[in-house]
């Protein structure tokens, strides 16, 4: 049976910028698990241009000796205002 865990973080991308955001699961990551992050803009009541995912990079880190994936998303905000967003992290392991 698969185990699914979800975490949500809140971030903001400034107006008219391209910025890298780095995500990882943390200490309870298990080898051979599936890790991903989805982005959900939270610009309530604003007519907005969608955020663009310019690049997606995946690497492995071991900050305390335990291997875990690290996802680097490059996002572009073409709006003339800052856009807050949720980063929904998912980890699936068996």
How does the language model describe each region?
Residues 89-91:
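Conserved aromatic beta-strand anchor motif in extracellular beta-sandwich/beta-rich domains
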Residues 2-83, 93:
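Extracellular attachment/recognition segments
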